[in-house]
Amino acid sequence: MSQGRLEERLTISKRELARLLKELKKWSAPATVLLSLYIPPGRPLSDVMTLLRQEYSITDNIKLKRTRQAVKRALSAAMDRLQMLTSTPPNGLVLFCGEDMSTGKFECFMFSPPEPIRVFYYRTDKRFITDFLEDMVEDNNAIGIIIVERDQATIGLLKGARLEVLKELEGFVPGKHKMGGQSQRRYERIIEQMVDEFFKKVGEEASNLLVPLAEKGVLKGVIVAGPGLAKQEFVEGNYLDYRLKKILAPELVDVAYQGLQGLKEAVMKAEKVVEAQMYRDAVNAMEEFKLHLAKGTGMIVYGEKDVEAALEMGAVKTLLIHESREDLEEWVEKAKSSGAQVIVVPESLAEAEWFLKTFGGLAGILRFRISTV
């Protein structure tokens, strides 16, 4: 096989990389037998082979026979695969090789990532070192969400179709009492000072969690939400970092809850800010699918053969596909070819497990009824 053809086969997409990282993170070993190798573009493979041969030659110093054999096997597999190439691909090369010592299962993953590798790195460890790949699968359309009350706050993030709680905070602010006169005013000042301190704490946590994303260009906006006037006090006060203020949504959002439930409510209500976000699209598409299913309208299709036939006819308006499906990329391409919108159903969606078990994680909403349905 030619170098160009092999490079094409080795190159993986961001979705494929995200799926692979999820698998790699499951691997662990009782000893340092899992090999991780990062080769940046332009690095001569001959240099890498020399390093691996040197590492192989010193494995005899490993005292435990099982560990020694596992490391040798990983190094041999890496060298065998590198010999298939004459040069490093344009985005570099990554190898993860190792044995699951509890089952004896051995795997060696070699691929060229969707973005260039920046470092040359080799290590055998108790886990695969995936740190240098994490940024490549980070969604570039993130929205920060801050739900704030005078004594509670939640900081969350919407990344693509994933909604997650980053931090939950609690403060202590006493309630009202029946004092009068100066005592009342002094008590109120103390309460306001406590609220001020809590807001400062929320602002600091928001800076720690969200500013790095804003500086990388990942964070596209910040929503401030809450049940009362506290959110307005928080925004009007000098509590938010200027880098977050620049991308602050102009409208505050009323929500009744904290935590993940509050974040979901904020996302659904802040339509103008997150209308392009996949999470809201996934929620709406799933609701439409369930409505057609309940009413028996004949405007949905499921089952791989029927979905494929409907796509070929151009009858699918929206293709819903669960993010865990191994053939996700293939269906995305088929949908694009037929002009269908693709909704990737995230595992965080309430109906995700039901959708996967009942429909195999694949279904379509139709533009018009077809006879195969």
From Swiss-Prot:
Record's subcellular location: Cytoplasm
PANTHER family: PEPTIDE CHAIN RELEASE FACTOR SUBUNIT 1
UniProt cross-references to HAMAP family, sorted A to Z: Rel_fact_arch_1
Predominant subcellular localization, coarse grouping: cytoplasm
Any one GO molecular-function label of the UniProt entry: translation release factor activity, codon specific
Recorded GO CC terms: cytoplasm
Alphabetical list of NCBIfam families matching this protein: aRF1_eRF1
Gene3D superfamilies: 3.30.1330.30, eRF1 domain 1 (3.30.960.10), eRF1 domain 2 (3.30.420.60)
Role according to the record: Directs the termination of nascent peptide synthesis (translation) in response to the termination codons UAA, UAG and UGA.
Keyword terms, alphabetized: Cytoplasm, Protein biosynthesis
Pfam families for this protein: eRF1_1, eRF1_2, eRF1_3
InterPro entries the UniProt entry points to: eFR1_2_sf, eRF1_1_Pelota, eRF1_1_sf, eRF1_2, eRF1_3, Peptide_chain-rel_aRF1, Peptide_chain-rel_eRF1/aRF1, Ribosomal_eL30-like_sf
Encoding gene (name): prf1
Protein known as: Peptide chain release factor subunit 1
Subunit description: Heterodimer of two subunits, one of which binds GTP.
Family according to the record: Belongs to the eukaryotic release factor 1 family.
